[in-house]
């Protein structure tokens, strides 16, 4: 998994993402409600809920807000009548893309996703067309840190792998169900991560050039603007040199 860390690939998009914070909160609340309905309201016994809580806190959601969302899910709120839908497709430059949605209307959701692909030079694929290129993992990220210290603590806590990148960033990979436990162990060792999330990790990367990179980012933005889309995963790799031109 050599290459540039997500810090290099996403830093230039931070301002645009911050502007979407209101929509992000809505999507996180929807996931909290659904996770609590399906697996109960205890994050320690519900890995999906724990991941949603971690994401909520990472985005500075208040405890009151997330606790209300969990209570709605446990209580059978109407917003909890959602189903998870995964769409797969190909983006600019042959990138493999997976889109995780929460929806109460499949027809509406697939129409919005297909529209985004068609506008940005991509194609919506069939089930299984790119899923084999991704593995569901927990990713605990440090923008900077001592590699040996983090590696020792992470592996002792049950992490699967620790990767250090050229820019000094470090990612700790875990089984997705174990991410919360490993993160807690790292914090107890005095190692506070910059982020912790469940992600779909690609086994191969597709290098983006100055022509395909902006097209890929436009597609990602269009997909993320869809109300039903929770997460967009892809295997596009944008180098520092290309990112500097965007």
From Swiss-Prot:
The keyword Cytoplasm applies. It holds the Pfam family TACO1_YebC_N. It is found in: Cytoplasm. Its main location: cytoplasm. This is Probable transcriptional regulatory protein YebC. One of its GO terms (biological process) is regulation of DNA-templated transcription. The gene is yebC. One of its GO terms (cellular component) is cytosol. Belongs to the TACO1 family. Residues 1-20 are annotated as: Disordered. Keywords: Cytoplasm, DNA-binding, Transcription, Transcription regulation. The keyword Transcription regulation applies. GO terms for molecular function: DNA binding.
